[in-house]
Amino acid sequence: GTLEADLAVTNGVITALLDPPNDPADARGAHAAYLVDVTGLVVAPGFIDIHSHADFTLHGSPAAETVLSQGVTTLVGGNCGWSPFPHTGHGLLQRASSFMHPEVDWTAHDAGSFGRVLAADPPGVNVVLQVGHASLRLAVMGTTNRAPDATELAQLCALVEQAADEGVRGYTTGLTYAPCSYAALPEITAVAKVAAARGLTHATHMRDEGAGLLGAVDEALAIARRSGVRLQISHIKALGTA
């Protein structure tokens, strides 16, 4: 249920929950540095949007008014295998991600430099970064449709370690989208093992959400079991006719 009360906040921390006064001009309000009348509204913690692609637009719209107006105060980006890093600076990721209409400062090649660009014009929301497997593959292998060789797999893993060092909190796959769709179970498991060792989660847009849904769930679970990574299936649903 809900509770009707007055709420006191000091330095960003709730410090008192008080029965509402009969008189709106109660003396305790006079001692507040800032008084907000939210009579008839709901006070809630800021919402966390765990599935966002805002990392591709925050450089162009750092105030993030559209999400703040919905009560969202934390965005988790890098989902579905797509993150604005790492990239080689040759425009491949920029072109491949054009369907998201990115507003990205492409001078940032890795998670560290991307974060510094964000910090230079701080967004209006908290931002959690993840590194996407499609972006990793483009940086190492381009658009090639094959399994990585040993050197390339080592490079993929090294880039995940670098991203973890630079502050990302997750590793993601989008197995319906090329070039991430070219990655098979052994490749993803190897990279996910590195992610797990660095404490990252694995969020996946599975390989199939229609007739092959159950097989796609099995694949996601197999990756988690074999690698030890914590799994989050981004939008589990069934498409098609019942």
Predicted regions and their residues:
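Di-metal (Zn2+ and/or Mg2+/Mn2+) metal-binding site signature of metallo-dependent hydrolases
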Residues: 42-66
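Short low-complexity, flexible loop/linker segments enriched in glycine and/or proline
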Residues: 36, 89-93, 98, 187-188, ...
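Histidine/acidic residue-rich metal-binding segments in metalloenzymes
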Residues: 113, 119, 147-173, 179-242
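Histidine-rich, glycine-flanked metal-binding segment
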Residues: 1-46, 61
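Divalent metal-coordination and catalytic microenvironments
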Residues: 12, 40, 51, 71, ...
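Divalent-metal coordination cores built from histidine and acidic residues
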Residues: 60-169
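Acidic, glycine-rich active-site loops and adjacent beta-strand->loop/helix elements
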Residues: 53-56, 80-83, 208-210, 237-239
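Hydrophobic faces of well-ordered beta-strands that scaffold small-molecule active sites
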Residues: 46-52, 75-77, 127-131, 171-173, ...
